[in-house]
């Protein structure tokens, strides 16, 4: 089955789109990537999304218009990705997250909430292709975090017979899936995963701040590599209660966003840091937060760490991860084991759509999300009659 996967992550860079050919069933899948592209948002639309994510007051009418605008961009990406290729049978669209709130165990019946714009009904109507969307809602309704949702895809495509592996997504927010060796007894019961905290989001915001928007990220980590990290600041930032919270857990820009960055910059200036050293220290914060999370919550450090997402191209971040993990962990991108690291998240939502529509196969991992049960993920939007 030819499936399209669509997602725009917390970095709000644009829409990652892929066309894949999926065959097989359950966890025994073959997934071939035919094409992957990123379609940047128009700048005005991106700024509207970022403003809404930052909590800027917006009228219901404006949100409705933004929802439609995002759906149109997603539909256009779906149409473009399949040009000159076999037409898609199915679309899996994550949409654009504008708000994510984990469950609050201190309140009675306080489910989490996750809100994505770019409604699937509109995408199905505009493309003429059956679309699955709203993937997080079922897991959240079952008491889960609704995140991370890629872990079952990691199990399916990246687990190994003998190696302890971690798959670390370095998007705006980082998330990890721990994959014990398949040779271990009851290995699937030992899988775990969670959001590790900020990956690119704070560095991206700082780069945009310091360049007045001319640059949106630190390419290859070249800017941060020129500075010196201030470890006492990293020590201070790691006192954030999120990092000590036991998995399952998830987070987003609601915590690690523009306000958090502003507070970090104020504190950095008190310590006499310039812009370069601040970027270096933020990158060190990402590296140390990831490794500290592993040390706290994994049964052991991984034999192999597989990176994906935009941060997988940040050579300085990779260098700092290697330093803190030590030489016993080999770090690679998922490309090195056959899964495109730039479009892994888009591929994941194509697979989740396939499981939902074609097989009625649960897509979540309750050990990872905290849901009370396996769930069918996503709402199915059929092609309108007469299309």
Swiss-Prot record:
Sections of the chain in a coiled coil: none
InterPro entries: Anhydro_N_Ac-Mur_kinase, ATPase_NBD
Top-tier EC class: transferase
Enzyme Commission numbers on file: 2.7.1.170
Pathway(s) of this molecule: Amino-sugar metabolism; 1,6-anhydro-N-acetylmuramate degradation; Cell wall biogenesis; peptidoglycan recycling
UniProt-annotated binding residues for ATP: 9-16
One BP term from GO: amino sugar metabolic process
Catalytic activity: 1,6-anhydro-N-acetyl-beta-muramate + ATP + H2O = N-acetyl-D-muramate 6-phosphate + ADP + H(+)
Assigned keywords, A-Z: ATP-binding, Carbohydrate metabolism, Kinase, Nucleotide-binding, Transferase
Gene3D superfamilies tied to this protein: 3.30.420.40
Keyword Protein biosynthesis tagged: no
GO MF annotation, one: kinase activity
The keyword Oxidoreductase appears for this protein: no
Domain of life, source organism: Bacteria
Its job: Catalyzes the specific phosphorylation of 1,6-anhydro-N-acetylmuramic acid (anhMurNAc) with the simultaneous cleavage of the 1,6-anhydro ring, generating MurNAc-6-P. Is required for the utilization of anhMurNAc either imported from the medium or derived from its own cell wall murein, and thus plays a role in cell wall recycling.
Family: Belongs to the anhydro-N-acetylmuramic acid kinase family.
Protein name per its UniProtKB record: Anhydro-N-acetylmuramic acid kinase
The encoding gene: anmK
């Amino acid at each position: 089955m030819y499936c399209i996967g669509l997602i725009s992550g917390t970095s709000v860079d644009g829409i990652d789109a892929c066309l894949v050919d999926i065959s097989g069933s359950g966890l025994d899948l073959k997934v071939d990537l035919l094409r992957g592209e990123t379609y940047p948002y128009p700048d005005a639309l991106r700024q509207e999304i970022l403003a809404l994510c930052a909590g800027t007051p917006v009228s219901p009418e404006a949100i409705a218009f933004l929802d439609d605008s995002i759906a149109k961009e997603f539909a256009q990406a779906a149409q473009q990705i399949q040009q000159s290729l076999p037409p898609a049978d199915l679309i899996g669209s994550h949409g654009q997250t504008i708000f994510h709130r984990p469950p609050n165990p201190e309140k009675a019946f306080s489910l989490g909430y996750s809100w994505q714009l770019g409604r699937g009904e509109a995408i199905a109507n505009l493309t003429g292709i059956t679309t699955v969307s709203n993937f997080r809602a079922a897991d959240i309704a079952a008491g889960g975090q609704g995140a991370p949702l890629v872990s079952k895809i990691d199990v399916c495509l990246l687990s190994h017979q003998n190696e302890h592996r971690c798959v670390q997504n370095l998007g705006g927010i980082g998330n990890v899936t721990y994959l014990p060796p398949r040779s271990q007894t009851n290995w699937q019961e030992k899988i775990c995963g969670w959001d590790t905290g900020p990956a690119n989001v704070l560095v991206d915001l700082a780069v945009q701040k310091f360049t007045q928007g001319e640059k949106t990220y630190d390419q290859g980590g070249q800017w941060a590599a020129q500075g010196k990290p201030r470890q006492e600041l990293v020590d201070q930032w790691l006192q954030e209660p999120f990092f000590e919270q036991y998995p399952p857990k998830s987070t987003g820009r609601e915590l690690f966003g523009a306000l958090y960055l502003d507070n970090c910059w104020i504190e950095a200036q008190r310590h006499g840091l310039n812009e370069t050293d601040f970027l270096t220290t933020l990158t060190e914060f990402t590296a140390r937060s990831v490794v500290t999370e592993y040390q706290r919550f994994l049964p052991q450090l991984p034999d192999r760490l597989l990176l994906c997402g935009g941060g997988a191209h940040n050579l300085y971040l990779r260098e700092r991860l290697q330093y803190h993990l030590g030489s016993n962990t080999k770090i690679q991108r998922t490309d090195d084991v056959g899964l495109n690291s730039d479009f892994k998240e888009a591929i994941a939502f194509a697979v989740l759509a396939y499981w939902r529509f074609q097989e009625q196969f649960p897509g979540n991992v309750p050990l990872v999300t905290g849901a009370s049960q396996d769930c069918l993920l996503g709402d199915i939007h059929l092609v309108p009659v007469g299309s």
